[in-house]
């Protein structure tokens, strides 16, 4: 009996520690959220080195900060393209959220500024590359390896949700691996501060929760569904719902039917049935106990949540890095000259950036 009592006391203590941490974190976030500063650096402060990725309205480059010689990832967004693709609100959200959050498994924003043509977000550089490329290379991760990553996402979402933030874009491409083998969630382009429900259709087809597809108002529970998709994909090597056309993927998602590979253990299957749960009144993370239903589920029985948060657990995989500015874990992209207009574009739309 004694042993059980100490275990439950430990749980109570841990819960108290978490609550205190989150309360403090919320105060710090609220303060930065309200301040929402503009222009904290300039393009001339950085040497642009190489493109790490491209998107529909911009690119990400590794840069070196001239005064400190530190390396960063600079996200460059073309204002006119952002406006054309109706992503102004999303982009302002992204910058406002990034400048206010601070958590071990979330990428942090160090500087931001704009010029006549572009918006710039200078983020910490994470040299290990995307989880996506490592997962494709090895096929699938073992359950302990998958669990190590999943635990970090659980903690990151617990933090974000406590701040009334929905992430909405979980997928292996948006998870970077740092030099210690831990995760950093990147790309807050779809993140949003929401106290109740929201209706925007956004995300990646394979990872969309059924309520988003069905155009219902939805809440933070969409992130827990996406966690289920991610855990499945890490442990299987492919997502639970896939097809050639998005419409076929959506049909599978809303059907509520999931098939598991034979190598999945029973605890993993149980967790996934509770995360990939179409019925919101039954989905883990969305019930009375909140995130604790997930943290206390059997698949996570061996997880020391505090030790994960403190990065005290040895990572199952350390990416090869030749130094702080190494880009060998990223793909190569065609380089393009940065064109900056002589007149200011979209001043009104991005006044608060």
Swiss-Prot record:
Family annotation (SUPFAM superfamilies): Protein kinase-like (PK-like) (SSF56112)
The gene coding this protein: Pka-C1
Catalytic activity: L-seryl-[protein] + ATP = O-phospho-L-seryl-[protein] + ADP + H(+); L-threonyl-[protein] + ATP = O-phospho-L-threonyl-[protein] + ADP + H(+)
Annotated ATP binding sites: 52-60, 75
Cross-referenced PANTHER family: CAMP-DEPENDENT PROTEIN KINASE CATALYTIC SUBUNIT 1 (PTHR24353:SF153), CYCLIC NUCLEOTIDE-DEPENDENT PROTEIN KINASE (PTHR24353)
Stretches assigned to the Protein kinase domain: 46-300
Tissue: More abundant in adult head than adult body.
Native source organism of the sequence: Drosophila melanogaster
Lipidation (N-myristoyl glycine): 2
GO cellular component: cAMP-dependent protein kinase complex; cell body; cytosol; dendrite; mitochondrial matrix; neuron projection; neuronal cell body; nucleus
Subunit architecture: Composed of two regulatory chains and two catalytic chains.
Regulation: Activated by cAMP.
Protein name listed in UniProt: cAMP-dependent protein kinase catalytic subunit 1
């Amino acid at each position: 009996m004694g042993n059980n009592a100490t275990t439950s006391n430990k749980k109570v203590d841990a819960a108290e520690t978490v609550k205190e941490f989150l309360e403090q974190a919320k105060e710090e976030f609220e303060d930065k959220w309200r301040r929402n500063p503009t222009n904290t650096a300039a393009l001339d402060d950085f040497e642009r080195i190489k493109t790490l990725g491209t998107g529909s309205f911009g690119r990400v480059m590794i840069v070196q900060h001239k005064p400190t010689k530190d390396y960063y990832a600079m996200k460059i967004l073309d204002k006119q393209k952002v406006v054309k693709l109706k992503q102004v609100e999303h982009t302002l959200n992204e910058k406002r959220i990034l400048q206010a959050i601070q958590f071990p498994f979330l990428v942090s924003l160090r500087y931001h500024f704009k010029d006549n043509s572009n918006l710039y977000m200078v983020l910490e550089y994470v040299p290990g590359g995307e989880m996506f490329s490592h997962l494709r290379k090895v096929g699938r991760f073992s359950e302990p390896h998958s669990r190590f990553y999943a635990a970090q996402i659980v903690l990151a979402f617990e933090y974000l949700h406590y701040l009334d933030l929905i992430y909405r874009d979980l997928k292996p491409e948006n998870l970077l691996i740092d030099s210690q083998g831990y995760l950093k969630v990147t790309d807050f382009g779809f993140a949003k501060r929401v106290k109740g429900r929201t209706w925007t259709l956004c995300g990646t087809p394979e990872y969309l929760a059924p309520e988003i597809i069905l155009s219902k108002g939805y809440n933070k529970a969409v992130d827990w569904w996406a966690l289920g998709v991610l855990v499945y994909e890490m442990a299987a090597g492919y997502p639970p719902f896939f097809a050639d056309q998005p419409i076929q993927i959506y049909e599978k998602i809303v059907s509520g039917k999931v098939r598991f590979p034979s190598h999945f253990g029973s605890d993993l299957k149980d967790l996934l049935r509770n995360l990939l749960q179409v019925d919101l009144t039954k989905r883990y993370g969305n019930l009375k106990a909140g995130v604790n239903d997930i943290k206390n589920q059997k698949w996570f029985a061996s997880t020391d949540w505090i030790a994960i948060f403190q990065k005290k657990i040895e990572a199952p995989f350390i990416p090869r890095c030749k130094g702080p500015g190494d880009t060998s874990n990223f793909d190569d992209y065609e380089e393009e000259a940065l064109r900056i207009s002589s007149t200011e574009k979209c001043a009104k739309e991005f006044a608060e950036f």
